[in-house]
Amino acid sequence: MGEVSAIVLAASQAAEEGGESSNFLIPNGTFFVVLAIFLVVLAVIGTFVVPPILKVLRERDAMVAKTLADNKKSDEQFAAAQADYDEAMTEARVQASSLRDNARADGRKVIEDARVRAEQQVASTLQTAHEQLKRERDAVELDLRAHVGTMSATLASRILGVDLTASAATR
């Protein structure tokens, strides 16, 4: 490029030395040389530099669009999963509440059954004890009635100091 500038500069100096007057409205050769160089550089950049950059930008835009679509899809899946989770938790809470209420009812029933059995056992034990005490009382009463004579004679002999056993035994 340095040579082209030198040539353009030399041509402009030669034109001035030749005595020509330059009109700024009429383009000279330098303008066309610079224009040609600009167009060549523009064509090279447009042909070799811009298409790969545009390709990379399009790929980036496609990747960003895909990422946005994936994010949207993920958000929808998360919302659906959250809704399923909330529904499952609500159902589980209802089921747990039902099981808890059933367990409480069963517990009350078991306690009531145990209480009824205990009351029956107590009543049965009291009845058995009452019957046993009655039998023992009757047995003791019969025993006492059978031995009342000998016991009274022994007691009287202890109190009086006289042996009444022989006379009581004869009776």
From Swiss-Prot:
The lineage of its organism: Bacteria, Bacillati, Actinomycetota, Actinomycetes, Mycobacteriales. F-type ATPases have 2 components, F(1) - the catalytic core - and F(0) - the membrane proton channel. F(1) has five subunits: alpha(3), beta(3), gamma(1), delta(1), epsilon(1). F(0) has three main subunits: a(1), b(2) and c(10-14). The alpha and beta chains form an alternating ring which encloses part of the gamma chain. F(1) is attached to F(0) by a central stalk formed by the gamma and epsilon chains, while a peripheral stalk is formed by the delta and b chains. The gene is atpF. It is found in: Cell membrane. It holds the Pfam family ATP-synt_B. The keyword Ion transport applies. Keywords: ATP synthesis, Cell membrane, CF(0), Hydrogen ion transport, Ion transport, Membrane, Transmembrane, Transmembrane helix, Transport. This is ATP synthase subunit b. F(1)F(0) ATP synthase produces ATP from ADP in the presence of a proton or sodium gradient. F-type ATPases consist of two structural domains, F(1) containing the extramembraneous catalytic core and F(0) containing the membrane proton channel, linked together by a central stalk and a peripheral stalk. During catalysis, ATP synthesis in the catalytic domain of F(1) is coupled via a rotary mechanism of the central stalk subunits to proton translocation. Component of the F(0) channel, it forms part of the peripheral stalk, linking F(1) to F(0).
